[in-house]
Swiss-Prot record:
SMART domains found in the cross-reference section: HAT (SM00386)
Species assigned in the record: Mus musculus
Composition bias type Polar residues, residue spans: 71-83
Domain notes: The MID/MTR4-interacting domain is necessary and sufficient to mediate interaction with MTREX.
HAT repeat intervals: 314-346, 404-436, 766-800, 986-1018, 1075-1109
InterPro entries: HAT, NRDE-2, TPR-like_helical_dom_sf
Positions of region (MID/MTR4-interacting domain): 171-275
PANTHER family: NUCLEAR EXOSOME REGULATOR NRDE2, TETRATRICOPEPTIDE-LIKE HELICAL
Alphabetical keyword list: Acetylation, Cell cycle, Cell division, Coiled coil, DNA damage, Mitosis, mRNA processing, mRNA splicing, Nucleus, Repeat
Summary of the function given for this chain in its UniProt record: Protein of the nuclear speckles that regulates RNA degradation and export from the nucleus through its interaction with MTREX an essential factor directing various RNAs to exosomal degradation. Changes the conformation of MTREX, precluding its association with the nuclear exosome and interaction with proteins required for its function in RNA exosomal degradation. Negatively regulates, for instance, the degradation of mRNAs and lncRNAs by inhibiting their MTREX-mediated recruitment to nuclear exosome.
Name the UniProt record assigns to this protein: Nuclear exosome regulator NRDE2
Biased composition annotated in UniProt, kind: Basic residues: 84-107
Domain of life the protein comes from: Eukaryota
Compositional bias per record (Basic and acidic residues), positions renumbered to this chain: 120-139, 300-313
């Protein structure tokens, strides 16, 4: 069938090409719409004749009428032109649409039908030839290029091969190359004809020996295998967080008759279903029956909550409304706003009450960004109501740190500090933030920032900054910031600046001239600069007199002639720094660097007696200028803070002074693993010598992680420096402070004796001799003759050296000097307690002769008569009198401590020592249960008074003292239980329970944690330990629970590995690893995610060491660079990385140099030393 039926017979009648050319009206631009009427009439006639069965007549068209119609406008077109333009446009659109549809249908018929009749095909070819002739007549210039024209039009319609005259023009040569053929080495897959194979066989191959694998998609339908989701996927984690549906039982009224058995109801006893015409089988429930009847549920049923989730949502909505009401009524309550912010976590964890539909709950619950935005919106509302609240602004900055850029966050910090320059907590947070930004960090920048902070706060404290008043606790906070700066410089390797800061602060605090005391701090610092640059000996140096003496000398005029001491020998220099040049280069660098850190921690100054100048210094970094320390000098007016300054200085020098940094910078300063050492405590649990370093190293110490921390002292020059500090500072103190400082000096020497006992026994004799000489010299001073603390340490020293009889003589002499003070003297109780404990630990048998000596000591303590040496067993009467005296003294102390709100200091001082002596006395005379009863009685009495949870600001001092007393008593309790377990058979459960209760109250006590980890390591039940650690870490703000939880898991892993090895070789265990490695890694990640753990160098060192021990080098590198993002100032991290990754030595040194950390041995100097 032709495309246009009106010209079907025309194509058959006319064979001439001229008619076909002129009748090609599809391409004739002169065709008009008026021809449509005549064409449609001819089509109707042809259709009518075809339906009657007669052959269609042949029409003969005359060319001239068609030409005239085509050359001029027809009457029909003129009539149509006079109609409205709107109808004309509509007809054109309709005609084009019909033409498009017919053309599309024609192409489909041509492409799909291959069995059309020859007659129809001839008609189609004739009509196409007529149209082609008409195009040739209209374009005579083209002539013989008809085939080219047809080929050009091939992009618009189909072309029959018979219509083309010259077959050579069918194909066209494209001379433009296709770069894709060269690039992909094959044709584009869209240009390759596709076909479908039927079957996978191939002719000509042997099916038994050969096979062809056809590429392409298989005809079989692929079934997607859905893997089961595990518990840690997002969907399942969300399900785990949802609240479980409460299951409520239906309790039946209890019968009075005794029940002999509990009957089990049978399902057959259930009520038989009721049948009806609607429910003939009785299988429909009530809801289905109502639906079949066209009814709905009852009104009361529809109003009831359909699930537990609805009730929870209703309760949660009520809490939200309550919070909104309360903050609307009390917009100035900042704590209420903070509680509202914390409440958003609970709202987002709940099954989203604000969800828009199903599935939205999980998205809302898991969307961290949505949670942060909600919290931020609440905080912004709170700040609008309280524009002066620093706490709310700090909370906002901490929240914005999750999704703000560091640069934007730093600008907000600076704006906040500009508005509140007198807020010390704000300064502390800002310094910690800047200290942990690796991109912008450098030692000099942060050092100047510390100086700016301290100088600004000094101006506020002096009143120079009139716009902002002084806040309470400013001086204590300034001292804490000063210590934080010193620890920062020590960890960065700049030990010389740390020592110079303490030297300047001691002179600025204790040797200040009277003429400048009333001046502002800034002016005092200006007067101090000439003294610092004068070359006068400073604190710790020989001949130091202080700032005041130098000022008097300047006012009198003249000069002081310094003569060299001829008795002193020259300082012994190291023979050579590199002892073995065959070692790898990184090992040599680490050894030399650590050696220089140990020897060169004091600032270098030119020796005028040797005519030295500043140019003689080989390392300019060892010289400290006044510009490096001037801004950090602060004024301390409190005597307690002045004494803490000396204690902190001695602690930096390695002296066990008992000083701990403030809580704000404690974990920033923690960088060594001495908190896990428990060897001495295991040997002697009662008389354990605790140096109380708390994981903080001293100056000049850059040791490897895991090496035991011994107080072995410094070299000769360093020891002389420490002695000079004591000699200069001791005359400045008096009373209890001087006694405590003398005790610290003696404990420092005893610690070196203990080091010699365990490592170098060759030096034990000389070290013991010098230590006894110091003790005797201190006791010879008039104010120390009755100092029982010094007598106690001297006797303990003799006992450690093995001189038991001499130690007993010292103890007896000290106790005979006490007189009749009885149980009211704390120092006397401590002396007697140590004496009795040493006697108990001397004999392995608790019922031996030494036990009688211990009972004698504790009994004579209660008597009013002077003390007498041990002569024999104590009588039962004396024991009963002593017990009665202890009871009365304990009741008296407890009554005084609990009666008044601020407990008296005298009662608190003697209470702890008295309870410990009484517990030991009861243990020796009755047993361990009696001692435990004393502990329980005291603990129950003082627990409510101590307010362990949250002491108020007005009674924080008294509560802290009571807490310290309880902590000391708890430690005595655990030590006594451990000692009893060593000498007798005793269950482990009481000790475990005691430690658990104590650690919940004192989560920062490292001694208790060490004992807990050790006893739990002997147990095979790890679940209780893990649950306990999880409970403490969730509630406590300290970092010690995390550290000891990791240590406990590492000990367990070490135990499992030791069992799986025989003779040093690994045994293929049949049991799995139990996931200890993943558990330890998860503990590390959770600890680092906390606020205090993120900036703790010790935690990062432990994490890096653990991953290296597993052999995963790439992951260890990632953790190292992650640690640098949080602690870029810690030099020990870089040195650990050099030991773990020797190939990265140059890169790590470049980073250290870029961040301005102290590098004492550049690689260039190392090469020169190796060449020599």
């Amino acid at each position: 069938m032709a495309l246009f039926p009106a010209f079907a017979d025309v194509s058959e009648a006319s064979g001439d090409g001229a008619f076909r050319k002129e009748l090609d009206w599809l391409s004739n631009p002169s065709f008009r719409v008026g021809n449509l009427t005549s064409l449609s009439r001819q089509t109707e006639e042809v259709t009518a004749l075809a339906s009657e069965g007669s052959p269609p007549p042949r029409y003969s068209f005359i060319r001239s009428p068609l030409k005239s119609e085509l050359s001029g406008e027809s009457n029909t077109s003129e009539k149509l032109a006079q109609t409205s333009r709107k109808k004309k446009k509509e007809k054109k659109k309709r005609r084009k649409h019909q033409h498009h549809r017919k053309t599309k249908r024609r192409h489909e018929q041509l492409s799909s039908s291959g069995s059309e009749s020859d007659t129809e095909a001839g008609k189609d070819r004739a009509s196409r030839s007529i149209r082609d002739d008409q195009k040739e007549a209209e374009k005579p210039c083209q002539g013989s290029n008809a085939a080219a024209a047809v080929a050009a039009a091939a992009g618009h319609r189909s072309i029959w091969l018979e219509d083309i005259h010259d077959l050579t023009d069918v194909f066209r040569t494209d001379k433009k190359p296709d770069p894709a053929n060269w690039e992909y080495k094959s044709l584009y897959r869209g240009d390759i004809a596709r076909y479908k194979r039927k079957g996978d066989s191939c002719l000509g191959i042997n099916p038994k020996k050969q096979c062809i694998s056809w590429e392409g998609a298989s005809a079989a339908k692929k079934h997607s295998h859905r893997h089961l989701e595990r518990y840690f996927t997002k969907k399942n984690v969300g399900l785990m967080r949802t609240e479980g549906i409460a299951v409520c039982s239906n309790p039946e009224p209890a019968s009075s008759e005794p029940v002999t058995f509990i009957p089990v109801k049978d399902s057959a006893e259930a009520a038989t279903p009721v049948t009806s015409w609607l429910n003939p089988l009785g299988i429909y429930d009530q809801s289905t029956t109502q639906w079949l009847q066209g009814q709905g549920p009852a009104e009361q049923e529809s109003k009831q909550p359909d699930s537990q989730q609805d009730r929870e949502n209703a309760a949660l909505k009520a809490r939200v409304e309550e919070f909104n009401r309360r903050v609307r009524e009390n917009p100035w309550d900042t704590q209420l706003w903070m509680a509202f912010v914390a409440f958003q976590d609970e709202v987002m964890r709940s099954p989203g009450i604000y969800a828009l539909g199903e599935g939205e709950q999980e998205k809302h619950r898991k969307s961290l960004k949505l949670l942060l935005e909600k919290k931020l919106a609440v905080l912004e509302r709170a700040i609008e109501s309280n524009p002066g609240s620093v706490e709310l602004k700090l909370a906002k900055l901490q929240l914005c740190s999750e999704f703000w850029e560091p640069s934007a966050l730093a600008k907000e910090w600076q704006k906040l500090l500009f508005l509140h320059p007198n807020n010390t907590s704000l300064w502390q947070r800002y310094l910690s933030f800047c200290q942990s930004q690796f991109g912008t960090f450098s030692v000099s920048k942060l050092h100047s920032l510390y100086g700016k902070c301290l100088s600004t706060l000094s101006a506020v404290k002096d009143g120079s900054m009139l716009s902002h008043p002084v806040l309470p606790g400013t001086e204590e906070a300034m001292f804490g910031l000063f210590l934080q700066q010193c620890h920062f410089l020590r960890q960065a390797g700049h030990s010389e600046k740390v020592i110079s800061l303490f030297q300047a602060m001691v002179d600025f605090t204790f040797f200040k001239p009277d003429s400048v005391k009333e001046l502002p701090t800034k002016v005092q610092v200006e007067f101090f600069e000439p003294f610092w640059d004068s070359g006068e000996p400073r604190v710790g140096e020989k001949g130091a007199r202080g700032w005041r003496a130098w000022m008097h000398q300047q006012e009198r005029g003249g000069w002081v002639l310094i003569t060299p001491d001829e008795d002193d020998e020259e300082p012994e220099e190291e023979d050579q720094e590199i002892k073995d040049k065959t070692l790898p280069r990184w090992q040599i660098w680490l050894a030399v660097e650590r050696s220089r850190d140990q020897r060169h921690w004091r600032p270098w100054r030119p020796d005028k007696t040797k005519k030295q100048t500043e140019e003689d210094c080989e390392d300019p970094e060892r010289q400290v200028l006044f510009d490096d320390i001037g801004q950090s000098l602060i004024r301390l007016s409190s005597p307690d803070l002045q004494f803490q300054l000396i204690q902190a200085f001695l602690q930096f020098l390695g002296v066990p002074s008992g000083f701990l940094p403030p809580a704000s910078c404690l974990y920033l300063a923690m960088d060594e693993s001495s908190i896990f050492e428990s060897e001495l405590y295991d040997e002697k649990p009662l008389t354990y010598f605790n140096p109380s370093f708390s994981g903080i190293s001293c100056v000049g110490s850059m040791e490897q992680l895991g090496r035991p921390r011994w107080t072995k002292g410094h070299n000769r020059e360093g020891e002389e420096f420490v002695r000079n500090v004591f000699h200069l500072v001791l005359p400045l103190l008096a009373g209890k402070q001087k006694s405590q400082l003398s005790l610290s000096w003696l404990r420092y020497e005893i610690a070196k004796v203990i080091w010699c006992l365990h490592t170098k026994k060759k030096r034990l004799k000389s070290q013991g001799k010098s230590c006894k000489k110091l003790a005797k010299n201190l006791l010879k001073e008039p104010e120390n003759r009755n100092n029982f603390c010094l007598w106690k340490q001297y006797a303990h020293l003799e006992w450690l050296l093995g001189n038991t009889e001499d130690a007993r003589k010292v103890f007896d002499t000290a106790l005979s000097m006490a007189g009749s003070s009885e149980l009211k003297d704390r120092e006397l109780c401590e002396l007697s307690l140590l004496y009795a404990e040493l006697e108990m630990e001397l004999s392995p048998d608790s019922r031996g002769a030494t036990t009688g000596r211990a009972v004698h000591i504790l009994t004579r303590l209660t008597e009013s008569s002077p003390y007498g040496p041990y002569t024999g067993q104590v009588s039962s009467t004396q024991v009963l009198k002593a017990r009665k005296a202890y009871e009365l003294a304990l009741q008296d102390c407890l009554g005084q401590s609990c009666a008044s709100s601020p407990a008296p200091a005298e009662a608190l001082d003697c209470l702890g020592s008295l309870v410990r002596c009484f517990m030991l006395f009861q243990y020796l005379t009755v047993g361990i249960d009696a001692a435990v009863q004393i502990y329980g009685r005291v603990f129950a009495k003082l627990k409510g008074s101590a307010r362990l949870e949250d002491p108020g600001p007005e009674d924080s001092t008294s509560s802290q003292s009571l807490t310290n007393v309880l902590e000391a008593v708890s430690m005595m309790h655990t030590s006594l239980l451990r000692f009893h377990m060593n000498v007798c058979v005793y269950p482990l459960a009481p000790l475990r329970e005691t430690l658990s209760d104590a650690l919940k109250l004192y989560p920062g006590n490292q001694v208790l944690w060490r004992a807990y980890v050790q006893i739990q390591n002997k147990s095979h039940s790890a679940n209780k330990t893990r649950r306990f650690f999880d409970t403490v870490t969730r509630s406590a703000k300290h970092l010690e629970p995390w550290l000891f939880a990791i240590e406990a898991e590492k000990l367990r892993k070490k135990l499992v590995e030791s069992v799986q090895r025989v003779g040093g070789r690994e045994v293929h265990a049949t049991i799995p690893e139990t996931g200890l490695t993943h558990r330890i890694r998860a503990l590390f990640e959770n600890a680092i995610r906390s606020d205090k753990g993120n900036q703790c160098p010790l935690l990062w060192r432990m994490y890096l060491n653990f991953l290296v021990s597993l052999g995963n080098k790439e992951r260890s590198k990632g953790v190292f660079y992650k640690a640098l993002q949080s602690c870029p100032w810690a030099k020990v991290l870089y040195m650990d990385a050099m030991e773990y990754f020797p190939d990265e030595l140059q890169e790590i040194l470049d980073v250290m140099t870029e961040k301005e950390l102290r590098v004492r041995l550049p690689l260039e100097e190392l090469e020169l030393l190796l060449e020599d």
